[in-house]
Every structure is written in structure tokens, then in C-alpha cells.
């Protein structure tokens, strides 16, 4: 998935992918990786053209989209499973990312 050889970036992405249901704070990622938040942000901007926070949100939205397409779980349950703080926040983020409401994904 990543063509970067930067081990900090690869490990950060792997940690994010493993912690979608209970996301880590960016500060926690930095502590785990032994880098500053500024260094992590530079890595993400350089190799992925986005901030760590935006990348993490994108991962969570992609997981939600998969769940909407592959399960019969309610939109609310999926929003919760992907760690969005509210259904309205999830709906806004989803619509911004995919140009459609989550309920229209099925």
C-alpha cells in the first residue's frame, strides 16, 4: 500500500489500521513511534499529501463504507464502530468524502 521505506510512516499507518474501532490520539502515535508530532505531520504530508488526522479519518470512512456495503448494520452502529462521536458528525464527514449520504450507500 505504501511505497515509502520510512519505517515510522509505515508503522504509523499500520497502527492506525489496527486501531480503527478505538482510534489512538496522534500524540499517542508519536509517543509509540518516538517522533514529535511535527515530524509525523511532515512524514504524512511528504508521502501521503495529508495530515495524520485527515489520513486516519479517511481510513475510518473507508471502513464505514465497506461496512455499509457489506453488512446490514445500522448507520448509527457503523458510525459508532468507526469511532465517530455522533451520527451527524459521521454523516457530514461521509458526505464530504464520498459525495453521498451514508444511507444512500446501500
What is each PLM-predicted segment?
Residues 14, 23-28, 35, 45-86:
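Terminal helix-turn-helix DNA-binding modules in bacterial transcription factors
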Residues 69-70, 81-106:
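…primarily DNA-binding HTH/wHTH and HhH modules…
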Residues 11-14, 18, 77, 104:
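Charged/polar, solvent-exposed surface patches and flexible loops
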Amino acid at each position: 500500500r505504501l511505497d515509502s521505506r520510512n519505517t515510522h510512516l509505515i508503522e504509523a499507518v499500520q497502527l492506525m489500521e489496527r486501531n480503527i474501532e478505538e482510534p489512538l490520539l496522534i500524540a499517542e502515535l508519536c509517543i509509540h513511534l518516538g517522533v514529535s508530532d511535527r515530524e509525523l505531520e511532515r512524514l504524512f504530508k511528504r508521502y501521503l499529501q495529508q495530515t495524520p488526522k485527515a489520513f486516519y479519518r479517511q481510513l475510518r470512512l473507508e471502513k464505514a463504507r465497506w461496512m455499509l456495503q457489506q453488512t446490514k448494520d445500522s448507520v448509527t452502529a457503523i458510525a459508532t464502530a468507526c469511532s465517530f462521536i455522533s451520527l451527524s458528525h459521521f454523516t457530514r464527514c461521509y458526505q464530504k468524502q464520498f459525495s453521498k449520504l451514508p444511507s444512500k450507500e446501500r
